[in-house]
C-alpha cells in the first residue's frame, strides 16, 4: 500500500516552495560572497583593507537586524523572560553560543586566506571535503550511522580531491588577477600615508600578514612529490573541519530541548553578539590592526566590492541559520554543490581559469560521489530516525526526527495520531 506523503497538500506545497526558495537564496548569496571576496582584493591578490573589519561589520548588520525583529517578537508574544539571565543555568545556555560564534569567526577569516592562494573554482571544489568532515563529525559527535555505500562514496570523494590536487597548480603567483583597479572610498590622511610608507621598514605592514611563506613540505617526501600541496589546500581542509563543527554544533543548540520553541532571531542575536566580540578583540589586540585603524581609519582600503561583501555575508549567514533551524546540515551541504558548478563556470569566463583534461575527468567524480552518498541513505530499522514530540511555549505540538539532521513538523492537535508518524 502506497504511503501518503502528506495529509495537507497545500501545506506541503508551500513547504516545498519555501525550501526551494531558501535554497536558491543561499546559492545566490554564497556564490556572490566568493566572487566579492575575490573582486575586493587588489591586483596582487592582497587586501588593502583589514578583512576583520568586513567581518565585524557583517556581524553588526546581522545583530541589528535580529535584535529589531526579536523586540517585535517579544512584544507580540510577551516573552520578556527571554531577555533575562537570572540563573546560572540560563547564563550557561547563553554562553553556549560563544562556541559556534568562535568557530564561525575563524571560518569567515580563513576564507580570505584561501582565496589569496586558490582560484575560486578550485576553492569550491576542494571545499567539498566538508562532506567528509561533516559525515565524520555526524558519526563521532551525533552517533549517526552510515551504510557501507556511503562510506565507499566518501572514500571516492577523498581520492578524487587528492587526484584533483595532484593535477593542479594553485600557488599564489599562478593566480590570475581580476584586472580591476579599486577606487578607495576615503582619501588617506597624511598620517596614513606616512604610516604606509614607513611600515615596510618597520616590518609591520598589514598586507604582509595576509600571506604565508610558500610551503615546501613535498621536497622531503619523494613519495608524495607529485601532489602539489600548497598552503591554500591546507587552509581549506582546516576550514572544512571548522565550518563542519560550527554548523553541527549550531544546529544542535538551535534545536535541543526548549531551544526549539525559541525564536530564531533571539537565538541568532546571542550568536552574533559573540561574533562581534571575537572580531572586535582581534582588531583591538593585534598591534598592526590597531596601528592601521589609528592612522588610517576603520574603513581604510574598502571599495565597492568589500562594502557589498559586508551585506552579502550578513544575509548569507542569516540564510544558513534558517537552513540549520528548519532543515538540516545535509541540505546546506547539498546546496553548496550547486555553488560549485556556478563558481567553476564563472571562473572559466571571468578569472581566466583554464581547467586541464584531468580537471574535467576528476571534477565530475567529486559531484558523482556526493550524489551516491545522498542517494544511498540508510533504510534499515537500525538506521531509522528517532522520533520525539515536544511542546513549545505556545502549547503547539512539534515532531522531531533525528537523522541526517533535524526535520521538524508541526502537528495539529486533532490529528496527532499514529498516522502522523508516517509523515515525512
Swiss-Prot record:
Keywords from the named record: Antiport, Glycoprotein, Golgi apparatus, Membrane, Phosphoprotein, Sugar transport, Transmembrane, Transmembrane helix, Transport
TM helices/strands, residue ranges: 9-29, 54-74, 94-116, 120-142, 148-168, 229-249, 264-284, 304-324, 331-351, 355-375
Residues carrying covalently attached carbohydrate according to the record: 204
Ranges annotated as biased composition (Basic and acidic residues): 408-417
Its membrane topology: Multi-pass membrane protein
Compartmental location: Golgi apparatus membrane
Lumenal side: 30-53, 117-119, 169-228, 285-303, 352-354
Residues found modified as Phosphoserine: 394, 416, 419
MF terms (GO), sorted A to Z: antiporter activity; pyrimidine nucleotide-sugar transmembrane transporter activity
Disordered: annotated span: 395-424
Pfam families: Nuc_sug_transp
Disulphide bond pairs: none
Reaction catalysed by this enzyme: UMP(out) + UDP-alpha-D-glucuronate(in) = UMP(in) + UDP-alpha-D-glucuronate(out); UMP(out) + UDP-N-acetyl-alpha-D-glucosamine(in) = UMP(in) + UDP-N-acetyl-alpha-D-glucosamine(out); UDP-N-acetyl-alpha-D-galactosamine(in) + UMP(out) = UDP-N-acetyl-alpha-D-galactosamine(out) + UMP(in)
GO cellular component: Golgi membrane
Keyword Phosphoprotein: yes
Cytoplasmic compartment segments: 1-8, 75-93, 143-147, 250-263, 325-330, 376-424
Role noted for this protein: Probable UDP-sugar:UMP transmembrane antiporter involved in UDP-alpha-D-glucuronate/UDP-GlcA, UDP-GlcNAc/UDP-N-acetyl-alpha-D-glucosamine and UDP-N-acetyl-alpha-D-galactosamine/UDP-GalNAc transport from the cytosol to the lumen of the Golgi.
Quaternary assembly: Probably forms homooligomers and heterooligomers with SLC35A1, SLC35A2, SLC35A3 and SLC35A4.
Family per record: Belongs to the nucleotide-sugar transporter family. SLC35A subfamily.
Protein name stated in the entry: UDP-sugar transporter protein SLC35A5
